[in-house]
């Protein structure tokens, strides 16, 4: 083989390697995306329409339901949605931060804490909203006081979540909001 032919072959092999390494990978399946955008829309709606009327209550239960479906899905899913990918770890978070927050294809260890906090608050809002309407708690202020406090905490978490998504999009030079729409991310330097 001549030098130039060898160079051509080498370049072609390199091209194949590069295109395989950066080919898009499926990360968020349809159920994860549907549950995410349902949760986002219902939370945003209830934070604005906060008078506790029938519509507020129905929309709130739909959001909590979307979250429960997502968590049940984690029990059977085999992709990045599975429960094994949702286990937060202090040690993993420390190592991740020490390494300069390297790119993750699934949830990164730091963002995972916020995901669980948001889910816990949505569950708490569903429960406190429900018990505030029970006859047993008629005249009691504390269920709705806790509900209001959790709603404020959720608003703060959502703002941090959005800052996190934008910050990591910039840090990794990757459009994370688009990945939650299409379900795809680029392959390559993925950790998991
Ligand atoms: C994502 C879920 C939810 C969010 C973000 C949310 C948010 C809020 C907010 C911000 C308020 C106003 C609190 C205040 O007085 O300062 C409120 C009130 C209330 N919410 Fe929710 N909520 C959610 C789910 C629910 C659910 C599932 C119920 C079911 C019963 C519910 C029932 C109520 C009631 C009864 C009030 C009291 C209204 C009043 O008397 O002033 N909420 N909610
Ligand atoms: C009230 C609004 C929102 C709530 C409550 C919320 C909540 C969540 C939750 C619970 C997850 C975990 C998803 C899962 O594993 O099932 C998540 C992930 C994500 N959310 Fe949101 N979200 C909201 C708004 C948004 C918006 C407006 C965007 C886009 C600008 C966004 C972008 C993302 C992305 C990109 C991820 C995946 C993060 C990653 O790559 O690890 N979210 N969000």
PLM segments and residue spans:
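Membrane-embedded alpha-helical bundles that constitute the cytochrome b-like, heme-associated redox core
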Residues: 1-192
